């Protein structure tokens, strides 16, 4: 009776995560009782529908949500192990889903072992799950450096992560944050540049704040986000007016990395395309960024800021002449500079831990958009 009720509830539920949990329960019921084979068939068919509805062509969640990626991988592995232990055939679509989810998981988590704060993610410890996968013999490899709209370039000491993906469809955008072209830098296992994280409680105003472009390490025009979100009643805010990624390039060589991309999120309202290229020179431990503001026909002049968020434990100091900002990250020292534009430090909010916030600092470049194409060049160099 309870499973029949669950089946009815699944049909009515809007949340795919709820469907996934219910699907697992129905499959377990079908495996546990000999005369309940119809539940197993129903559950496996539902699982196939979830894959078709929720995953893109690369097997990554259409929401682009990394927490959801982990959630799906855990449940697919669990269901596969139940089928194996009960000596039932394992459908190929389950193996394929685990293969693709595992490839993504090893790139966005296992290869760097630090949570990247994009699109609904916050700090969590996946070590127990890693041990669980290892104990069951699941080993994933990924030779690529891009998945789900995220690029991760790395060596033994440094990782550069950037969001080069368009926004998800409206129905998958509950946890989307307007951080197109935002980036994070990991240096010697510590986060040097970060995004501000995600406040998960959607009924709290901090949820909307954490979704804004200003809480990401990227460019903001006129204090507006690159995507317009709309809240319906007391539900999640969703993408109302989105953006498209209109170019992308990735280079990784031994002594030179580069990620380049552009989006049109400010084109309609302000007549500006944001084009960003970040270069890294491993031998010099130097990052050079080029934020290009490309003017379109409907250009409107207004203010802009480019923010570089820092974790709460990081200390900063601006030189008296205002030309440099020094960053102290434990035993590392870094120097930030930007010629021809004002740089400063401001206090913000960090949402890295689930449903909590604390003050942090961010470095920002400020200026006014010009009636011609602009290039804002900035540098971040390790000095100790």
Question: Locations of the language-model features?
Answer:
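Aromatic-lined, polymer-binding surfaces characteristic
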Residues: 1-98
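Alpha-helical packing segments of well-folded alpha/beta enzyme cores
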Residues: 2, 6, 72, 101, ...
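Catalytic micro-motifs at enzyme active sites that drive phosphoryl/nucleotidyl and oxygen chemistry
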Residues: 12, 170-173, 206
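CBM-like, beta-strand-rich accessory domains located in the C-terminal region of large
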Residues: 16, 201-384
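Residues that flank catalytic or metal-binding motifs in active/ligand-binding sites
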Residues: 22, 149, 179-181, 215, ...
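Carbohydrate-active enzyme catalytic cores, enriched for enzymes
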Residues: 60-194, 198, 370
């Amino acid at each position: 009776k309870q499973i029949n009720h669950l089946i009815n509830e699944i049909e009515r539920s809007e949340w795919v995560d709820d469907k996934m949990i219910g699907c697992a329960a129905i499959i377990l019921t079908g495996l546990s009782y000999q005369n309940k084979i119809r539940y197993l068939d129903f559950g496996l068919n539902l699982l196939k529908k979830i894959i078709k509805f929720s995953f893109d062509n690369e097997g990554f969640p259409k929401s682009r949500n990394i927490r959801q990626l982990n959630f799906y991988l855990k449940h697919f592995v669990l269901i596969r192990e139940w089928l194996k232990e009960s000596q039932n055939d394992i459908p190929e679509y389950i193996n394929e889903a685990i293969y693709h989810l595992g490839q993504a998981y090893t790139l966005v988590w296992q290869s760097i072992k630090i949570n990247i704060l994009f699109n609904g993610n916050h700090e969590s410890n996946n070590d127990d799950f890693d041990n669980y996968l290892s104990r069951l013999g699941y080993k994933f490899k990924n030779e690529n450096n891009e998945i789900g709209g995220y690029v991760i370039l790395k060596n033994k000491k440094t990782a550069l992560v950037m969001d080069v993906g368009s926004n998800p469809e409206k129905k998958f955008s509950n946890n989307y944050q307007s951080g197109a072209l935002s980036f994070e830098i990991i240096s010697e296992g510590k986060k040097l540049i970060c995004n501000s994280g995600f406040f998960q409680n959607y009924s709290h105003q901090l949820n909307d704040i954490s979704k804004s472009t200003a809480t990401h390490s990227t460019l903001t025009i006129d204090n507006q986000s690159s995507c317009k979100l709309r809240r319906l009643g007391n539900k999640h805010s969703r993408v109302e007016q989105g953006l498209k990624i209109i170019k992308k390039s990735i280079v990784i060589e031994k002594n030179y990395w580069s990620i380049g991309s552009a989006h049109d999120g400010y084109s309609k309202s302000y007549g500006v395309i944001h084009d960003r290229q970040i270069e890294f020179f491993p031998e010099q431990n130097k990052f050079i960024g080029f934020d290009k503001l490309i003017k379109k026909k409907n250009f409107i002049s207004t203010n802009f800021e480019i923010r570089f968020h820092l974790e709460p434990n990081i200390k900063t100091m601006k030189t008296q002449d205002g030309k440099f900002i020094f960053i102290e990250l434990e035993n590392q020292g870094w120097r930030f500079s930007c010629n021809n534009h004002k740089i400063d430090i401001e206090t913000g909010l960090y949402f890295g831990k689930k449903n909590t916030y604390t003050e942090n600092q961010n470095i920002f470049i400020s200026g006014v958009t010009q009636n011609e194409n602009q290039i804002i060049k900035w540098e971040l160099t390790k000095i100790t």
